[in-house]
């Protein structure tokens, strides 16, 4: 199996290169379960963020990073946009999303109670990797629909052309193949 050697936050990871289509492969970066990488990268991202009231992420891979950044910033909670409607959700708001790593169109949902918490607040959108930006754009639409003010968008890695974006915070670039 081909791999890509990633260096980030003083750590090294061998990422398997995964074929997504006939002309696109990516280095698969998964932070779920990697406590060390979350622990090292979260403070670096937190330092780059402006003042925020809430951290918002989409399930699932951004959750540990959102938790750790929230903890570092002394925020009492963070918000997770879900990929399906849960029984506890009352009047959820929703947007559609198309992601490079997901074959079918998906939706993101925000519980009405969470939407009310972030209304009029400064939020930072957090993810593990920003690639085409479609997931991030959907998350931004969702929180803006809730009335929040997006003041930052951040990830550990910017994949492919995302590295050239000026509107995101990231620690390292990740090539596509």
What label would you give each PLM region?
Residues 59-65, 132:
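Gly/Ser/Thr-rich loops at beta-strand to alpha-helix junctions
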Residues 4-5, 137-177:
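PRPP-dependent phosphoribosyltransferase catalytic core
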Residues 1-52:
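Active-site-facing substrate-recognition patch
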Residues 78-123:
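Short, glycine/charge-rich flexible loops or terminal/linker lids adjacent to PRPP-binding catalytic cores
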Residues 52-59:
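Short glycine-rich phosphate-binding loop at a beta-alpha junction
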Residues 73-74, 95-100, 169-172:
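Short, hinge-like loop/turn segments at secondary-structure boundaries
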Residues 65-73, 140:
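Short Gly/Thr/Asp-enriched flexible loops that form oxyanion-binding sites at enzyme active sites
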